[in-house]
Amino acid sequence: LYVCINCNYHFRMSAENRIKMFFEDGDYNEIIPDKISDDPLKFTDKKKYKDRLKEYRKKTNRDDAFILIKGKIKDKEIISGLMNFEFMGGSMGRAVGGAIVKGAKIAIENKLPYVIVTSSGGARMQEGIVSLMQMPRTIAAVDLLNENNIPYIVVLTEPTTGGVTASFAMLGLSLIHISEPTRPNN
């Protein structure tokens, strides 16, 4: 499970490998998040944000940093969202926020537990305030889960920082938090 047997070092696990581990019987279907327009701010640093998105989409074969799934673990159906650190450090922008909200809505509609696995550097700087707006959006979605008595479980993996930590991952709204050990600095 990505742990060194000699020194107990915990290696980072990809979102794809987590999916295989969670749904070991392969009993799952990905839910396609709603499409949104790229680059609402026309952001450019060393390269255009649109170009950076294209680069990461090609590299990861994913549209963004969140994978939404409906599947079964030991015959129990769940909705699961996994942050993909390989896509721009798992940063949360509009697409990630929208996918988290969509997952919450599906969990409520189907009365299924919602399990999120975090792995994120925080809010996506290329989206500025639009990215920061995802914090209250995701908090409201988790609050709706609680109002509807839907189990909400957060698995905190290394790293989980910034706006993700300050919003849906750690605000005490979840019923269960599970945390992996952090990796020591080398």
Please provide the spans of the model-predicted regions:
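Terminal-region recognition feature
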Residues: 1-153, 159, 171
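Single conserved hydrophobic/aromatic residue that forms the stacking wall/gate
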Residues: 176-186
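Gly/Ser-rich catalytic serine loop of serine hydrolases
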Residues: 157-167
